[in-house]
């Protein structure tokens, strides 16, 4: 057992040792002569030393930028001059002064770091620089001196050691310790500089022009760069001075060309008045084309700086200021520091951040994050793997679609959903083959895909592969929002031909072109696997698998019987199975799965209808669609429980995306269809509806073009007029066009509409023009009065006798008024009467039903039905015939002519 007393003593000793080591380390740091940190800079190593002091390579901690720390004694008179003039310069070929740190005994200057070392060392390594490089470097040096002269400053210490090279090989002028302000025609007397670079007037200690001595020094530099040695050099300093004053430099014709000799001779003229100006030097033929470029650049910079307001104007500077402000930095203090050239820590931070931003902008190849690069690789690999094993003719259209996928959309920040999809892979067996059509997945209405797709998933099933695979498939299938695969094609075709209700599709007419139905799958009774993974959310119900042993001939026969042409190339071999991803919604758990996918496309950009491409590369018609089970609008299913729901899809809906059923007019062989391009629509009875069809655009639809997501009462006030129909006595009625009530659908947020309501008297005005009745209801009644209880309906409605769905009949007892018996041209078009208040109508009288004893006309009861857009229990098919009204009249006559019997 461990002694607790001994363990506690051991812990105490360890703590004491840690404290002691930390104290010793801090004490050694204070007593050490070697510096490790100065301000925000961490000293890395010493890179130079001179009479002025030492130069260190340091790292700026906030930006991780390398700088040169030049130190000097505080009592050095040249350090003040250097800082004062150096901070005025802002030129590409002059080193930048970032920050000045003043301590008790030292002055530290943070300068731009030039990793190319000094030009003197560069010349020693090459022994002689080529003429082309000499022309470029000398043009840059002359441009820097021209800039300083334009700022009325003379350098007075131009030499190879004061010219640095950056990492790109550009010249940078530095060391402004002898710089002073000098105006035109001002003579100086102070002798300064290095002897071998001094002009003759300095050697003779005469008054001199500061601009001319800099030009002499430039001549010495150019001669040295071309030949590799100084023009006037000797071991004895006195002899060197004598040569400068009395001798001419030696020109080797093999090394120095004529134009270079002309320029050097003019620069090294003994008479200062004969030396050219820097503008003339930059225009000399030897420096072309570099001289003219540098001269123009320098003049533009000077003009911009003299005009003022150059700071904080560029796009980079504004963006940098915005970021600093968002980070909580006082940007106003930074601006004041830069404008007043304080060279403090704020100035150093700004200049280093700006240099870092310019470096990123000037980068030849912009950097990309690893995520973007990996996504691009995944796309290329997925495209390559998907193309294996498929013929070129099949892949030709699909590859064109896949190439259209852009990387910017893949990383769109506006995406409000997370998708995942494993790439599709193929398996081949002896008895069956799985063929995947690259363009078969035309399902752009769903926003999320499930992880499980038939086929073996990839080994590296990471998030980026899922995102890239989803968007590649989504881009290639950017249209046909309601495309689904039906395995019971033969059943629906045969049943619809016999007149039984089935899940057959409507013929759709879009912009004048009729799209033919397509058979995508062939039922196989011997297989338990699904031919296509059905979308469980499409059309409000799950289409069951076909269990009949239907042959291909039966499918062709049943398709031809109803006038549908089935593409023969789409009737696949029964050994071929087509697989599609199973769809799943992650968006909302409140709304039913039926309402989540009924509107089709969730992306407004992909709302256009386009035909799919078959296996042989031809454009084939869209597949047979599920017939809607109710005349309740399909769009209204997208209102998640209520119109106030905010978790529904936010995409815009186009009227052309809805399934528009065709209505057959009695006695006519043609089919009247609704086109999205026409405003006026004609139904089977010849009546015209302006803008809207019966329940095609729902009154409660949250995505309707006429309705807003907020409390819009437009659809309530513009409900479709009611037409009385009946299916029971029409033997020729094609029931494949009928619409059955939908069960399990969600109720809209609006209340039930009673039989006494109307749309602001619109129906009444139309009926009044035809002389059917007089209008006594007020058009200014509140819209909300349409909502009434079911108890009021029971008082105003009686039910006709007969089989099938009950037909509501207006109770018109005591409401008889004098009126005319007017009919339409066909003699049997009657209209339901809607009022906002009590019944005050002029009913229609029948000539053949009259009480001769009392000479009172018998009321011909008018059967009505409610608007079909609200999911009413009284909803029935719009395509019902007119015989319902006759049946109601006959039933009333049999009961003795009393409409309330």
Curated annotation (Swiss-Prot):
The modification Phosphoserine is found at residues 456, 533. The keyword Nucleus does not apply. One of its GO terms (cellular component) is cytoplasmic ribonucleoprotein granule. Residues 41-287 form the Protein kinase domain. Residues 500-530, 588-629, 745-770 are annotated as: Disordered. Residues 759-770 have a biased composition (Basic residues). Belongs to the protein kinase superfamily. Ser/Thr protein kinase family. Putative serine/threonine-protein kinase. This is Putative serine/threonine-protein kinase YPL150W. It comes from Saccharomyces cerevisiae (strain ATCC 204508 / S288c) (Baker's yeast).
């Amino acid at each position: 057992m461990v002694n607790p007393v001994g363990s506690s003593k051991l812990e105490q000793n360890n703590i004491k040792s840690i404290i002691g080591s930390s104290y010793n380390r801090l004490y050694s740091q204070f007593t050490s002569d070697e510096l490790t940190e100065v301000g925000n800079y961490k000293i890395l190593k010493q890179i130079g030393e001179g009479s002025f002091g030492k130069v260190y390579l340091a790292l700026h901690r906030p930006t991780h930028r390398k700088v040169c720390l030049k130190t000097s004694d505080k009592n050095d008179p040249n350090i003040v001059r250097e800082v004062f003039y150096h901070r005025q310069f802002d030129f590409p070929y002059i080193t930048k002064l970032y920050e000045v740190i003043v301590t008790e005994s030292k002055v530290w200057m943070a300068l731009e770091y030039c990793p190319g070392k000094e030009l003197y060392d560069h010349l020693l390594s090459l022994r002689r620089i080529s003429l082309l490089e000499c022309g470029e470097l000398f043009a840059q040096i002359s441009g820097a001196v021209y800039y300083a002269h334009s700022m009325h400053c003379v350098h007075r210490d131009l030499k190879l050691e004061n010219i640095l090279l950056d990492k790109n090989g550009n010249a940078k002028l530095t060391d402004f310790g002898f710089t002073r302000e000098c105006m035109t025609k001002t003579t100086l007397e102070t002798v300064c500089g290095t002897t071998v670079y001094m002009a003759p007037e300095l050697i003779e200690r005469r008054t001199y022009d500061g601009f001319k001595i800099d030009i002499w020094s430039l001549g010495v530099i150019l001669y040295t760069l071309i030949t590799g040695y100084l023009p006037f050099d000797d071991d004895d300093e006195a002899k060197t001075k004598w040569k400068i004053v009395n001798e001419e430099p030696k020109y080797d014709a093999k090394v120095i060309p004529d134009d270079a000799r002309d320029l050097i001779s003019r620069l090294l003229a003994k008479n200062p008045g004969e030396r050219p100006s820097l503008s003339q030097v930059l225009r000399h033929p030897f420096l072309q084309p570099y001289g003219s470029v540098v001269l123009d650049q320098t003049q533009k910079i000077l003009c911009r700086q003299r005009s003022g307001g150059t700071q904080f104007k560029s796009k980079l500077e504004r963006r940098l200021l915005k970021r600093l402000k968002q980070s909580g930095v006082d940007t106003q203090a930074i601006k004041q520091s830069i404008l007043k050239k304080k060279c403090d820590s704020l100035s150093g931070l700004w200049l280093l951040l700006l240099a870092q931003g310019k470096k990123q902008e000037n980068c030849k190849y912009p950097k990309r994050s690893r995520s973007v690069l990996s996504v691009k690789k995944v796309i290329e690999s997925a495209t390559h793997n998907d193309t294996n094993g498929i013929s070129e003719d099949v892949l030709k259209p699909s590859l064109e679609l896949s190439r259209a996928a852009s990387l910017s959309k893949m990383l769109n920040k506006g995406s409000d959903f997370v998708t995942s999809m494993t790439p599709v892979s193929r398996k081949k067996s002896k008895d069956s083959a799985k063929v995947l059509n690259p363009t078969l997945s035309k399902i752009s209405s769903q926003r999320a895909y499930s992880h499980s797709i038939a086929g073996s998933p990839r080994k590296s099933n990471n998030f980026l592969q899922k995102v890239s695979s989803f968007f590649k498939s989504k881009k290639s299938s950017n249209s046909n929002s309601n495309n689904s695969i039906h395995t019971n094609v033969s059943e629906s075709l045969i049943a619809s031909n016999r007149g039984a209700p089935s899940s057959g599709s409507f013929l759709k007419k879009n912009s004048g072109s009729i799209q033919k139905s397509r058979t995508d799958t062939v039922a196989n009774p011997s297989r338990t696997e699904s031919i296509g993974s059905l979308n469980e959310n499409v059309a409000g119900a799950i289409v069951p698998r076909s269990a009949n042993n239907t042959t291909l001939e039966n499918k062709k026969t049943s398709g031809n019987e109803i006038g549908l042409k089935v593409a023969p190339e789409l009737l696949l071999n029964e050994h071929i199975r087509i697989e599609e991803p199973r769809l799943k919604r992650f968006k909302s758990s409140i709304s039913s799965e039926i309402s989540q996918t009924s509107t089709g496309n969730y992306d407004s950009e992909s709302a256009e209808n386009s035909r799919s491409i078959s296996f042989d590369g031809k454009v084939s018609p869209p597949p047979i669609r599920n017939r809607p089970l109710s005349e309740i609008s399909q769009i209204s299913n997208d209102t998640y429980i209520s119109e106030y729901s905010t978790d529904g899809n936010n995409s815009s809906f186009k009227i052309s995306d809805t399934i528009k059923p065709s209505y057959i007019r009695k006695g006519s062989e043609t089919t009247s269809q609704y086109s999205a391009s026409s405003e006026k629509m004609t139904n089977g009875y010849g009546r015209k509806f302006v803008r809207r069809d019966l329940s095609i655009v729902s009154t409660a639809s949250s995505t309707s073009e006429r309705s807003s997501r907020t409390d819009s009462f437009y659809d309530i006030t513009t409900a479709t007029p009611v037409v009385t129909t009946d299916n029971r006595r029409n033997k020729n009625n094609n029931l494949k066009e009928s619409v059955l009530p939908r069960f399990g659908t969600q109720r809209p947020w609006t209340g039930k509409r009673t039989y006494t309501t109307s749309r602001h008297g619109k129906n009444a005005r139309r009926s009044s023009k035809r002389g059917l009745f007089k209008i006594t209801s007020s058009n200014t009644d509140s819209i909300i009065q349409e909502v009434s209880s079911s108890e009021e309906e029971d008082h105003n409605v009686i039910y006709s006798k007969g089989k099938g769905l009950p037909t509501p009949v207006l109770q018109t007892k005591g409401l008889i008024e004098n009126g005319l018996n007017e009919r339409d041209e066909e003699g049997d078009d009657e209209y339901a009467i809607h009022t906002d208040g009590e019944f005050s109508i002029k009913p229609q009288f029948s000539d053949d039903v009259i009480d001769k004893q009392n000479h009172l006309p018998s009321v011909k009861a008018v059967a009505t039905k409610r608007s079909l857009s609200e999911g009413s229990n009284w909803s029935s098919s719009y395509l019902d015939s007119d015989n319902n009204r006759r049946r109601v009249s006959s039933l009333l006559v049999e009961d003795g002519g009393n409409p309330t019997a």
